A protein has these predicted regions:
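Non-Sec secretion/translocation targeting segments of pathogen effectors
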Residues: 183-190
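Short, compact, well-ordered microdomains
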Residues: 139-178
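Ordered hydrophobic segments in well-structured contexts
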Residues: 8-12, 80-84, 148-150, 158-161
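N-terminal accessory interaction module
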Residues: 1-61
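Tryptophan-rich substrate-binding surfaces of secreted polymer-degrading and adhesive proteins
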Residues: 98-103, 114-117, 164-180
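Short, conserved turn/kink motifs that form compact alpha/beta structural patches or helix kinks used as
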Residues: 105-148
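Extended boundary segments
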Residues: 58-117
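Charged, low-complexity intrinsically disordered segments
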Residues: 24, 36-38, 67-88, 135-139, ...
Length: 190
């Protein structure tokens, strides 16, 4: 049983353009409903997302409650992600601006495959993979500048180059990283 098996849903907080800025999970139905009502009352743009299979009884709202940005019911699913690292001295531990002319996906190796919750962010993956007891810690170094995280959601993949602060989207490297993944699988690496 995963530590997130008891999550009953999450709230998507939207920015002014309607894009999801943050997702916060909830395990307690009353706390979840209270936060939803508080956000709706203040006019905060949110989309509550409910996992019905994780509820002991249906989540009900007061008659006439309007969700201007929507209310969704979903199956609780984990999203796959991968981490790629390189030992190429021309790009290892360097910012993207210094390396963009030298980056070659073929120099990267798939070092980890895992699953993340839909509310997890690149920053939360960074924290997870920089702990002393990080996943696959014996076979990969902690995450650092020049590493690439590939996320998968809704049939789309996106690649992110780790910068000293933040991430640079590098989807143009996806075809080469897919080849690196195939090489790793053929060699029996995980």
């Amino acid at each position: 049983m995963s530590k997130h098996d008891n999550v009953i849903g999450y709230i998507e907080y939207l920015d002014s353009s309607g894009c999801v800025q943050e997702r916060i999970p909830y395990v307690d139905a009353e706390e979840f409903k209270t936060r939803i009502y508080a956000s709706l009352y203040c006019g905060e743009p949110i989309i509550p997302v409910v996992f019905p299979e994780n509820l002991s009884q249906p989540l009900t709202f007061e008659k006439g409650t309007i969700f201007p940005w929507g209310l969704r019911s979903e199956k609780h699913e984990l999203l796959p992600y991968e981490i790629y690292q390189t030992n190429d001295r021309k790009i290892s531990f360097l910012r993207y601006n210094y390396t963009k002319g030298h980056i070659n996906a073929a120099s990267y190796k798939l070092v980890y495959r895992g699953q993340m919750e839909c509310w997890q962010t690149l920053d939360s993956l960074y924290c997870l993979h920089n702990q002393e007891n990080r996943p696959n810690g014996r076979k990969m170094r902690s995450l650092s500048v020049s590493d690439i995280i590939v996320t998968h959601e809704g049939g789309e993949a996106h690649a992110y180059y780790m910068e000293p602060i933040g991430y640079k989207q590098v989807d143009d490297l996806l075809p080469g990283l897919e080849q690196a993944k195939k090489r790793s699988v053929e060699m029996g690496e995980r």
